[in-house]
């Protein structure tokens, strides 16, 4: 039957990509339908019970700055919070939280059920409705046809998923859930380039059978307790719990080696490539054969369960080997396994077949987000989901897509890497992937993106008000520190010595003093008995106050580095956003090698910047392209004044 209501956007899948996509589309005013095979698993944390980490936490902050749900849901469900790399520079500091799985799902579902313009429906999708070169809807397993002008597909590991435990395997999207076999077959009919990837998860352990007296406790940060959302408060956090640390040993490694002849990875049963940066314990023992021990973190799954997640022993070994290797580790000698670990193989589609908006090049109105694009991780999925949902909404509103640049957001780095370079293995985000990471910090994600999010219709009044107060206070306080001076006469030598190590010998602005190593904002403001502080409080809210102080201090201390990076961005931007015509035949570009013209015709980059990042495309080839465009008057720059006004300063529109 044809469902009587026609929607603007259909989102298929209710994981981290799908939930953010549905919320973003609905926030923009698009009539949105979220189709999921099981409403009870909306926002399910299928693997580890944690959010954030190096690079990943940056993505979560960016999703939050654009009005997304992941950070706020983590604040409501997080049972341990830590700042990683806290002793290092601000560019690589990252927030990580352990989350209660049940509370996290509840927080996400609450937002979905209370979001205007969003409908939920429980049915697996078996088919897409395609007319010519555009998608027009989706068909469920019982034949209900839902019509829409755009579809966002966020199928996770469900596309033709196959679960492996030892040499046994069966179809499944994850443990306890069916695979999407019919939908996978339908997508293959559409001739979209695809492949197989693999990921895995460890066995789960009953905490009542763990001897914690033999383990090392790892508490969260308490002074201060971190929060994830820019609107978050530590008071929102539920009860906090520690994690625990144990280690593998030589006996563990011998047990694993003895089981490799029954490992699906090492017997060729699994063909998909696994994640390099989240390897199975089999991979670790094989790749790092000289290493005598590996650290294993025992992470609590929640406040109302005894289940623990042993981070570091993801495996697809036979269950008897899993049991033996767990029992070989200190504190786990009598551990009871609640669920076996497993590996899962699934279909993904080459992201080079996508536009930077995450719309497929072959089928208008069809967007992909999450693991279907070859990524791994909740955070990468959520970021893609938000972008795909946003651009699906803009597509039905007949507006240009918004595609963040590499110098603008980690989301921009993520998408640009995917659509220009593709993936040979599951892609995860690291700060090292961003060439402008000093400008792309966690602490300034809102400064970079919230104003754009407001222009796009993603940011509500509450967030906008808090952001505006913070932005204005940072600007005022920075200028005050630059224009407030102390002299040898006005600053007593003993005060100067206590703060700076010696008396000052000439006039300094407070900003110049703050720029010195080891000097803090509070230290500078405390000079002259506190007279160097602001005349009025920067904010009534203590959390907002700390954010303002952090922004001011980082902005002043790293001003020179940030300005140099801004100059570099400006230089590199000269041709970055010059568009390449849709119909160009690169064989006609004089001087291009056969290899380069073949790659350009195959991958169809949208801009000169994307073309330059395709493997094998040389700077000389880019110069020839620029000459060709100028000779024929084909090239045009993205980012007209009209587009910038409509989408927020710094947005890069791309033609649908």
From Swiss-Prot:
Residues where FAD binds: 13-18
One GO MF term: flavin adenine dinucleotide binding
A biological process term (GO) from this entry: tRNA wobble uridine modification
The keyword NAD is annotated on this UniProt entry: yes
Quaternary assembly: Homodimer. Heterotetramer of two MnmE and two MnmG subunits.
Family: Belongs to the MnmG family.
NCBIfam families associated with the record: mnmG_gidA
Protein name (record): tRNA uridine 5-carboxymethylaminomethyl modification enzyme MnmG
Organism of derivation: Burkholderia lata (strain ATCC 17760 / DSM 23089 / LMG 22485 / NCIMB 9086 / R18194 / 383)
Gene: mnmG
């Amino acid at each position: 039957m044809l469902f009587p209501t026609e929607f603007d956007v259909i989102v298929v899948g209710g994981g981290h990509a799908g939930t953010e996509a549905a919320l973003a589309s609905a926030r923009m005013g698009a009539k949105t339908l979220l189709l999921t095979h099981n409403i009870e698993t909306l926002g399910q944390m299928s693997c580890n019970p944690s959010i954030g980490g190096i690079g990943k936490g940056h993505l979560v902050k960016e999703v939050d700055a654009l009005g997304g749900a992941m950070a706020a849901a983590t604040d409501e469900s997080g049972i341990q919070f830590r700042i990683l790399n806290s002793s290092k520079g601000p560019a690589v500091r990252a927030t990580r939280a352990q989350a209660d799985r049940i509370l996290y799902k509840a927080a996400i579902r609450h937002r979905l059920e209370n979001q205007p313009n969003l409908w939920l429906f429980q049915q697996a999708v078996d088919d897409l409705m395609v007319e010519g070169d555009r998608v027009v809807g989706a068909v469920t397993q019982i034949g209900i046809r839902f019509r829409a002008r755009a579809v966002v597909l966020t199928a996770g590991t469900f596309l033709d998923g196959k679960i492996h435990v030892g040499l046994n395997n069966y179809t499944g999207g994850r443990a306890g859930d069916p695979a999407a076999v019919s939908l996978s077959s339908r997508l293959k009919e559409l001739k979209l380039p695809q492949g197989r990837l693999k990921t895995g998860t460890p066995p789960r352990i009953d905490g009542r059978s763990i001897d914690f007296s033999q383990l090392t406790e790892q508490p969260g940060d308490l002074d201060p307790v971190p929060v994830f959302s820019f609107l978050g408060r530590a008071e929102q956090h539920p009860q906090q719990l520690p994690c625990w640390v144990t280690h593998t040993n030589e006996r563990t490694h011998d047990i694993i080696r003895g089981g490799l002849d029954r490992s699906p990875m090492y017997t060729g049963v699994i063909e998909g490539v696994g994640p390099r940066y989240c390897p199975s314990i089999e991979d670790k023992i094989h790749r790092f054969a000289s290493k005598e021990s590996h650290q294993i973190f025992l992470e609590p799954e929640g406040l109302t369960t005894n289940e623990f997640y042993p981070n570091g022993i993801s495996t697809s070994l036979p269950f008897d080997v899993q049991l033996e290797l767990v029992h070989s580790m200190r504190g786990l000698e009598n551990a009871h396994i609640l669920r076996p670990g497993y590996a899962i193989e699934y279909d993904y589609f080459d992201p080079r077949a996508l536009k930077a908006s995450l719309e497929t090049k072959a089928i208008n109105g069809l967007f992909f987000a999450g693991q279907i694009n070859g990524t791994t991780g909740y955070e990468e999925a959520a970021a893609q989901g938000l972008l795909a949902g946003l651009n699906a909404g803009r597509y039905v509103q007949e507006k240009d897509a918004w595609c963040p640049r590499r110098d603008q957001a980690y989301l921009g780095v993520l998408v640009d890497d995917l659509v220009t370079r593709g993936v040979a293995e599951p892609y995860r985000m690291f700060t090292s992937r961003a060439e402008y990471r000093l400008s792309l910090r966690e602490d300034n994600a809102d400064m970079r993106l919230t104003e754009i999010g407001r222009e796009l219709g993603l940011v509500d009044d509450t967030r906008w008000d808090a952001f505006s107060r913070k932005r204005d206070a940072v600007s005022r306080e920075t200028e005050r520190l630059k224009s407030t001076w102390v002299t040898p006469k006005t600053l007593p030598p003993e005060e100067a010595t206590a703060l700076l190590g010696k008396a000052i010998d000439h006039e300094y602005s407070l900003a110049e003093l703050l720029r010195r190593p080891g000097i803090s904002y509070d230290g500078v403001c405390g000079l002259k008995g506190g007279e160097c502080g602001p005349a009025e409080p920067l904010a009534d809210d203590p959390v907002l106050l700390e954010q303002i102080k952090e922004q001011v201090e980082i902005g002043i201390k790293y001003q020179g580095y940030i300005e140099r990076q801004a100059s570099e961005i400006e230089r590199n931007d000269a041709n970055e956003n010059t568009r390449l015509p849709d119909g160009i035949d690169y064989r006609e570009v004089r001087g291009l090698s056969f290899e380069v013209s073949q790659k350009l015709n195959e991958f169809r980059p949208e801009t000169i910047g994307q073309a330059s990042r395709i493997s094998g495309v040389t700077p000389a080839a880019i110069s020839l392209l620029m000459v060709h465009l100028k000779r024929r008057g084909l090239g045009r720059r993205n980012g007209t004044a009209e587009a910038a006004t409509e989408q927020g300063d710094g947005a890069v529109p791309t033609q649908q």
